[in-house]
UniProtKB/Swiss-Prot annotation:
Name of this chain's protein: tRNA dimethylallyltransferase
InterPro entries xref list: Dimethylallyltransferase, IPT, P-loop_NTPase
Family: Belongs to the IPP transferase family.
Catalytic activity of the protein: adenosine(37) in tRNA + dimethylallyl diphosphate = N(6)-dimethylallyladenosine(37) in tRNA + diphosphate
Binding site residues for substrate: T11, A12, S13, G14, K15, S16
Residues passing through the membrane, by range: none
Site positions (Interaction with substrate tRNA): S100
PANTHER family: TRNA DIMETHYLALLYLTRANSFERASE (PTHR11088:SF60)
Assembly description: Monomer.
Region called Interaction with substrate tRNA, residue ranges: 34-37
Role this protein plays: Catalyzes the transfer of a dimethylallyl group onto the adenine at position 37 in tRNAs that read codons beginning with uridine, leading to the formation of N6-(dimethylallyl)adenosine (i(6)A).
């Protein structure tokens, strides 16, 4: 009997590794939920499965369009239907996994009308107070710390002049998937932060700067170039944002004052690169870099790590909206998923 499940979790939690392991054991098919992996040419920044992994397991949702081509949630739903048809015809399980909870939410809750974001001077507490008065059904489900949903609620309220929960109930399309079993990888923050830092170091060693240079030269202005990893690389390559010459000069001067001798180890420590990740900066790719060049690369790693950690926090908050899920460690989830598929 055909079965499908969703495996969710924050970025760097190990979703892809676990999904591939289970898919190989059960001869299953994987549908990637990653919003960057849909793009061709974006391999390192998306942490896309490598060639061997793609060859061992049939994947959908990967390398669908070029970076400058349009892709919508509607297109993703079509890809889901292709993946489901393939898996059900082969009578093998379909594992839906990735960090883009928005795609999954649209499929299990229905697709809501697109409403432009309304720029407001109100803070979360003020919007929440309005929601409590106008739409208590919504306010009962979310806290005033949930910036994403509060802004979405207020945008709908201003655009339609209706109670948002009632507007969405009337105008949201029917769910594409019903009764989907959802498994969530739960990782302690300290461990996840270490994984994020290690993955960032590996991305830099793998050549994310070269990948970014190619993308900015060939697809300048494309939407995915504003994503975490590529955005920071673009700033370094073109000396903008956090990598403006004057900012770097001041920071480098401060680092030299902090350390008596500014060697490579002290540069990495200045940017909080952990000792276990030093190896990625001491190999052949960077061993001939001068101190200032390494200083910039270390800052790049620091910024990507910080921004990815912030993304993980947002993903964790968003994933709370998925009800009736099983949340556990990778090891426990592996057992639970195999039990579900048996």
């Amino acid at each position: 009997m055909f079965k499908e499940l969703a495996l969710i979790g924050t970025t760097a939690s190990g979703k892809s590794d676990l999904a591939i392991k289970i898919a190989n054991e059960k001869n299953g098919v994987i549908l990637s939920l990653d919003s960057l992996s849909i793009y061709k040419k974006i391999d390192i920044a998306s942490a896309k499965p490598n060639k061997a992994e793609l060859a061992s397991t049939r994947h959908f949702g990967i390398d669908l369009v070029l970076p400058n081509e349009y892709f919508s949630v509607g297109e993703f739903i079509k890809e889901y239907k292709r993946a489901k048809d393939f898996a059900s015809n082969a009578n093998v399980p379909l594992i839906i996994t990735g960090g883009s909870g928005f795609y999954l939410k649209a499929m299990i809750s229905g697709l809501a009308p697109k409403i432009a974001n309304f720029k407001s001077d109100l803070n979360n507490a003020e919007i929440f107070a309005i929601a409590e008065k106008k739409d208590p059904k919504f306010a009962a489900k979310f806290s005033q710390n949930d910036t994403y949903r509060l802004q979405k609620w207020y945008s709908i309220y201003r655009a339609t002049n209706e109670i948002p929960s009632e507007f969405l109930a009337k105008n949201t399309s029917a769910p594409i998937i019903k009764n989907l079993k959802i498994f969530e990888i739960s990782t302690k923050k300290e461990i996840l932060n270490q994984k994020i830092a290690a993955r960032t170091a590996k991305m830099i060693e793998a050549g994310i700067l070269d990948e970014a240079k190619f993308l900015f030269e060939n697809y300048s202005g494309a939407k995915p170039l504003g994503s975490i990893g590529l955005k920071e690389c673009g700033e370094l390559l073109y000396n903008t944002g956090e990598f403006e010459a004057e900012i770097l000069k001041r920071e480098f001067s401060r680092a030299k004052k902090t350390a008596k001798i500014l060697n490579k180890t002290e540069i990495l420590e200045f940017w909080e690169i952990s000792p276990q990740n030093f190896e990625y900066f001491f190999n052949s790719k960077f061993k001939n870099s001068d101190d200032f060049e390494l200083f910039k690369i270390a800052k790049l790693a620091n910024l990507i790590t910080i921004h990815t950690t912030q993304l993980a926090k947002r993903q964790r908050t968003f994933n709370r909206s998925f009800k009736d899920k099983i949340s556990a460690s990778n090891e426990i989830l592996e057992v639970e998923i195999l039990k579900f598929l048996s």
